[in-house]
Regions:
Chain A
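Short glycine/proline-centered loop/turn elements that form peptide/ligand docking sites
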Residues: 187-191, 290-291
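Short, Lys/Arg-rich, polar N-terminal cytosolic tail immediately upstream
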Residues: 1-20
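Short alpha-helical segment that forms part of, or immediately flanks, the ligand-binding pocket
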Residues: 115, 192-193
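Membrane-water interface segments at the C-terminal ends of transmembrane alpha-helices
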Residues: 20-52, 69-153, 159-185, 213, ...
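Glycine/proline-centered hinge or cleavage motifs at structural transition points of membrane proteins
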Residues: 198-200, 212
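Short cytosolic juxtamembrane segments of multi-pass membrane proteins
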Residues: 285-293
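Glycine-rich helix-loop "coupling/hinge" segments at transmembrane-helix boundaries
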Residues: 52-56, 233-261
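A short amphipathic helical element positioned immediately N-terminal to and/or at the very start
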Residues: 58-67
Length: 293, 346
């Protein structure tokens, strides 16, 4: 009854489908416009600017100069980001693993409560804290000297690549842990118990049973961290004074002192490429996993 | 590793200040098949988990063979547990699932491969090595989970309702398959079930639990014919209880109550000597496949009996139970030992 009447209806008024499409369009439009205007357009513009000279002619000049001027900074960025990601992954796995497999209930509860705090501190403040903590006469060295663990003469500044790595890790570990611990908690408890029953200790359980099942969340967390580290300006500006430094600092330098958008965009191009490659690798991995599952 | 005896001594478990298991004593002889039977929530799973090492004891001792395993972590106990949900690892193939316990024991790859293939043959799943476990049927998963437990030749096999997720037909066939496998390997096995039929069919010894305590440990026949008390009897299908009358058979003259099963009570048959009889009004008549189940309203209780043909509702009928089918209970609802019968007859 109902189907036939609705068929008749749609046959009689074929153009009734039209308003529905436009209603859908209407709903999508704000989001679409925002993405186009605020994201796609600037992205395209910056890509184009990277390949145009001041007269508007096409050129690869900016890219070549960006590489020759800032090649070291690019390598430095890649290095710092890679070491940071490795550190972030290691610490996040350790914390989430303990949250899921830990045998001391009060320690697990305390850790669960503690690890999230850095999440609520912005990058600028993090940079400031790290600065006063890691400097030559900063808190870390003071404590080490006071407690007699280190001679005051051997105190050195950590405000270089090490400071960057530590700061990035401090800021990003809680975020990645949040994702990873959630995914690990979702792993069926009996999978862990079955493994332990089969003879696996906690560590093997973590790396052979829990982590493989939670890995997609780890990858997502690391890729988002990569993007965050490549885009943050405050931390490298505050922690590193000389050369080489992160590309964001160099881009800002290029724009504020020279008004040179061409080279700044060429540097940006490199950041895009780096994240794009990582995202592509991740997609390949997940697609292959889904194909075999 | 050869099969071993299991001994539980005063095993007590508290979870969140609540006593879940209360002073459990149990001896399981090597190579035997023991069923833990009892109503939902009585602590069967908890007991199994305590043996496997997942639930800490607040008192007591668990021994496997000569050694105490009470304080060992689960991975050092070498028990093999099959989980109710099977708990196959979804990121590993069938072969990897079976091979993981061997890998943990450092068995070389070639040897692993050979033993996985042999186990799959044994489970009648030959050639399934590279299948994803997510693509298996319920019965196949169950068998892989069993294979994963057996592949290390464990001294003790623990099964938590391994058949309860399966449909009736697979269940029956797996029941005998499991029993055959257990016998051929001679492995000490403890299985949790709340299905009395399953326990009676499979077990050498049944442990009947209630509210965290062991009520009775007996062979299936003994448990079926001489349940420790009325509660156990009801759990084992003794649906009818009557208070003893003067004219009732002399068996267990000290009995206050008799219990009997519905299928032992007949309706409107020629009266025989040495039987218990009760008269009542028929209130219900249900076809059960083997015959008709009749509900009888007597003065003291509602009783159930079996008839070959339907009986009109509202009519009066006589229920008759042979003396041999009567289970005598004392005033405290405890079963009267068979010794009493002899004394009574003498
Ligand atoms: N982690 C826990 N914390 C607190 N109480 C628990 C916990 N696990 C189980 N219990 C309680 O212990 C009692 C026994 O549970 P258990 O799972 O052993 O029962 P069971 O005999 O296996 O029941 P079923 O036949 O329904 O599986 C239940 O009352 C349950 O509520
Ligand atoms: Mg249970």
């Amino acid at each position: 009854m109902t189907t036939s009447s609705s068929q008749v209806h749609s046959l009689a008024v074929p153009n009734r489908r039209l308003p529905r499409i436009s209603l859908g369009m209407l709903l999508v439009l704000p989001a679409l416009t925002a993405i186009l205007l605020l994201y796609a357009l600037p992205l395209a513009r910056s890509l184009v600017t990277a390949f145009r000279d001041s007269s508007g002619a096409w050129t690869t000049d900016h890219v070549v100069r960006a590489f020759s001027l800032y090649g070291r900074d690019m390598l430095f960025s890649v290095g710092v980001v890679s070491v940071s990601l490795a550190l972030i992954a290691a610490i996040s796995i350790a914390i989430s693993g303990y949250l899921v497999l830990g045998a001391t209930p009060w320690a697990v509860r305390l850790l669960r409560w503690l690890y999230r705090w850095p999440l609520f501190i912005p990058f600028v403040v993090t940079g400031q804290i790290a600065r006063s903590f890691l400097a030559t006469n900063g808190m870390m060295n003071n404590v080490l000297v006071e407690t007699g663990l280190m001679a005051s003469s051997s105190a050195q500044s950590f405000l270089d690549w090490r400071g960057l790595v530590l700061t990035f890790a401090w800021k990003q570990v809680p975020f990645v842990t949040l994702l990873l611990a959630g995914a690990m908690a979702a792993v069926d408890r009996s999978h862990i118990e079955a493994a332990r029953n089969a003879g696996a200790n906690r560590l093997r359980c973590l790396f052979e049973i829990v982590l493989p099942q939670a890995a997609p969340s780890l990858w997502v967390g690391l890729i988002l961290s990569l993007v965050a580290m490549l885009s943050v300006l405050s931390v490298p500006m505050m922690l590193i004074s000389g050369n080489p430094t992160m590309m964001t600092a160099m881009m800002a330098h290029r724009i504020t002192y020279y008004g040179d958008y061409g080279i700044a965009n060429a540097l940006g191009l490199f950041s895009y490429a780096l994240t794009a490659v990582t995202a592509w690798v991740y997609l390949r991995l997940t697609l292959r996993r889904e194909a075999t599952a | 590793m050869s099969t071993e005896a299991l001994t539980l001594n005063n095993v007590t478990v508290d979870l969140r200040q609540q006593r879940i298991l209360d002073g459990i004593h149990l001896d399981v002889s090597p190579g035997s098949f023991t069923c833990l039977l009892g109503p939902s929530g009585c602590g069967k799973t908890t007991l199994l988990r305590a043996i496997a090492g997942f639930t800490p004891l607040s008192q007591g001792d668990i021994r496997l063979g000569a050694r105490s395993i009470t304080h060992l972590p689960p991975e050092k106990r070498h028990t093999a547990m099959v989980f109710q949900s099977y708990a196959l690892w979804p990121h590993m193939s069938v072969g990897d699932n079976l091979g993981y316990p061997l890998k943990l024991r450092g068995v070389p790859r070639a040897e692993r491969k050979r033993r996985i293939a042999a186990m799959l043959e044994r489970l009648e799943l030959g050639g399934f090595e590279s299948r994803a476990v997510t693509q298996l049927s319920g019965g196949q998963r169950q068998r892989i989970a069993l294979g994963r437990a057996l592949i290390i030749d464990p001294p003790l096999l623990l099964l938590d309702e391994p058949l309860s997720n399966l449909d009736a037909a697979i269940r029956r066939s797996l029941r005998s398959e499991l029993r055959r496998l257990q016998k051929s390997l001679g492995i000490t096995t403890i299985m949790v079930t709340h299905d009395q039929e399953e326990a009676l069919q499979m077990a050498d010894q049944i442990v009947l639990m209630r509210a965290g305590k062991v009520i009775q440990v007996a062979a299936p026949q003994t448990l079926y014919q001489q349940p420790a008390d009325l509660g156990v009897a009801r759990f084992l299908g003794v649906d009818n209880t009557v208070t003893r009358h003067e004219q009732d058979p002399t068996v267990g003259s000290r009995a206050a109550t008799f219990g009997f099963r519905t299928r032992d009570a007949r309706i409107n048959e020629p009266l025989r000597p040495a039987t218990l009889t009760r008269k009542g009004r028929v209130t219900e008549c249900v076809y059960t496949g083997d015959g008709y189940q009749i509900s009888l309203d007597t003065n003291e209780a509602e009783l159930f009996a079996t008839a070959n043909s339907p009986i009109a509702l509202g009519t009066f009928a006589v229920l008759q139970v042979p003396e041999s089918a009567l289970i005598p209970f004392g005033p405290d609802d405890r079963h009267l030992p068979p010794l009493d019968r002899h004394e009574d007859i003498a």
